[in-house]
UniProtKB/Swiss-Prot annotation:
Gene Ontology cellular-component terms listed: cytosol
Pathway: Cofactor biosynthesis; thiamine diphosphate biosynthesis
Source organism of the structure: Streptococcus pyogenes serotype M12 (strain MGAS2096)
Record's subcellular location: Cytoplasm
Residue ranges occupied by any THUMP domain in the UniProt entry: 60-165
Protein name: Probable tRNA sulfurtransferase
Length: 404
């Protein structure tokens, strides 16, 4: 027998009361986005399950994709069949025969939500267990911790049989907690911050600053590939490329070297906030980790934050670098992040950046710039690309070859 579908059990959605169906419908849409590379599948949801019909598609890549989607508590490959006792008996016998090995223990666990069905749960357990013994007389039944728990569900529309339960990613469906702008540089930290924001249901749009010719097409492709990795957790992501060359050259030419990083980050924050307002976001997300670099001391954060009243979420702020690296490896962004392309934060980095910049000094140096004009020109020049979870090469070099 081949699996008919993957049955998805919802996570925290069971606690969402009157908003439950909104959360479930969002999860359904996210699953459809993530499974877009598999055109034969079909997705439908009810109040306590989402059903992914395979329609002949190999179940294994579908399971691997669904395991990453936030809002999924658990999933099971299942056999779907008509609610017929003879069909159930045959299916259970075939499944257990295919699984059998010497010493195998099992139990039947039946759940009947269709109370009009001819047998109740206890009667079905007895009947189906007996059917297994007919074809496997040496198998052993065991009620506690058996090797195989064969789950049989009798629902209104059909009967379902499964024996695997695979842990999902948990969290909330992406998009159920509002929208935020993720400042993604291309380093290790910001993709991890984006992943953690996605886990709590935040719909992120990626803001990436590009300064050609100082930053290369490879750096842009790298940032887009990192964004593509993040789409596996909740579907399509809007990638916003911001032209930043003019601003960086202005800062380089007119500001003291010690304040280059502070002023650069203040402009980035202003621009991200303007894009957030334009695109109806609620928060800004970044990958700052307290004390990790000069721009991430409390004094630096205070001086940079002063340009906006928008909430700033820093998911990795208390994490050690090694913890961030481990998470980046777990979510498969690390190998991309360490590709050797310079980003806007590194091309003009001073040898001795100010670790305790004074807000008054930053504001004084900014009097040398046409702040509103620079920000407006940057925002008006953005390029928005929708990044989808299509199948791509693992290596950034292959992406660069396609650009050349």
């Amino acid at each position: 027998m081949d699996y008919s579908e993957i049955m998805v059990r919802h996570g925290e959605l069971s606690t969402k009361g009157k908003n439950r169906m909104r959360f479930i419908n969002k999860l359904k849409n996210n699953i459809q986005d993530v499974l877009a590379p598999f055109p034969a599948i079909a997705v439908r949801s009810d109040r306590d399950r989402t059903h992914v019909s395979l329609n002949g598609t190999d179940y294994q890549p579908i399971v691997e994709a669904l395991k990453l989607v936030f809002g999924v508590q658990a999933l099971s490959p299942v056999y779907k069949l008509e609610k017929s006792v003879p069909l159930l008996v045959t299916a259970v016998q075939d499944i257990m025969t295919s699984l059998y090995r010497d010493g195998l223990t099992f139990k039947i666990a039946t759940k009947r939500s269709d109370h009009a069905f001819e047998l109740d749960s206890r009667e079905l357990n007895s009947l189906l267990g007996g059917a297994v013994f007919e074809v496997l007389p040496n198998i052993q039944a065991q009620m506690k911790h058996p090797d195989v728990t064969l789950k049989v569900e009798i629902r209104d529309e059909a009967a379902y049989i499964s024996y695997e339960e695979i842990k999902g990613a948990g969290g909330l469906p992406v998009g159920t907690s509002g929208k935020g702008m993720l400042m993604l540089s291309g380093g290790i930290d910001s993709p991890v911050a984006g992943y953690l924001a996605l886990k709590r249901g935040l719909d992120i749009e990626v803001v990436h600053f590009a300064s050609p010719p100082y930053t290369s097409p490879g750096a842009l492709a790298k940032a887009q590939d990192l964004t593509r990795r993040l789409t596996r957790f909740g579907g399509n992501i809007q990638f916003i490329e911001v032209p930043f060359t003019e601003i960086q050259e202005e800062i380089k030419n007119k500001a003291p070297e010690a304040y280059l990083m502070t002023l650069t980050r203040r402009f980035m924050m202003r621009i991200t906030d303007a894009i957030r307002e334009q695109r109806k976001g609620l928060v800004i997300v970044n990958g700052e980790s307290l004390g990790q670099v000069a721009s991430q001391t409390l004094e630096s954060m205070q001086a940079i934050n002063a340009v906006t009243s928008t909430p700033i979420i820093r998911p990795v702020v208390t994490m050690d670098k090694l913890e961030i690296i481990e998470m980046a490896q777990a979510i498969d962004t690390f190998d991309i992040s360490i590709q050797p392309f310079e980003d806007c934060c590194t091309i003009f980095a001073p040898d001795r950046p100010k670790t305790n910049p004074k807000l008054g000094n930053a504001e004084k140096y900014e009097e040398r710039f046409d702040i509103d004009g620079l920000v407006q020109r940057a925002v008006s020049g953005i390029v928005v690309t929708e990044i989808t979870p299509e199948i791509v090469n693992d290596e950034v070099e292959n992406l660069i070859d396609a650009l050349l």
